[in-house]
A protein has these predicted regions:
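Short amphipathic alpha-helical heptad-repeat segments
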Residues: 2-21, 37-40, 54-73
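Charged low-complexity stretches with an acidic bias
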Residues: 60-99
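Short intrinsically disordered terminal tails
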Residues: 1-4, 54-58, 100-113
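Short, charged, low-complexity loops and linkers
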Residues: 1, 25-26, 46-52
């Protein structure tokens, strides 16, 4: 069951990365928006890399993501520049979305649109 959950999570994250890459249109969006999308992609790829490299169980991954969010919140509280807080906020929100997906997979209620 756990391998199925991890495989499902990887599938959802890969789909989100692909969709986000397709959303980047340099002609249509401003630089700040594209930077935000790039940060989202890098964060999702970090989670995917962690899954593949460490071969963690989904419960362990949930704890790791929660710890990373807590660490980023501390860093955001100490940040002195708007660019840094925007960057950290995007990472935190992306990781919160990953937690939502993990919880949905664990409950068996994941709906992908």
């Amino acid at each position: 069951m756990d391998y199925e959950s991890i495989d499902r999570l990887k599938q959802v994250l890969n789909c989100k990365v692909k969709k986000t890459r397709n959303d980047i249109r340099h002609e249509l969006h401003n630089k700040a928006y594209n930077d935000s999308l790039q940060t989202e992609i890098r964060t999702l790829e970090w989670v995917l890399g962690y899954i593949v490299q460490k071969k963690v169980h989904i419960a362990k991954l949930e704890v790791i993501v929660q710890d990373k969010i807590a660490d980023l919140k501390v860093r955001m509280d100490k940040a002195m520049h708007r660019e840094v807080t925007d960057f950290l906020f995007t990472k935190i929100e992306t990781l919160r979305w990953v937690l939502y997906v993990i919880h949905s997979i664990n409950k068996g209620s994941l709906i992908v649109i």
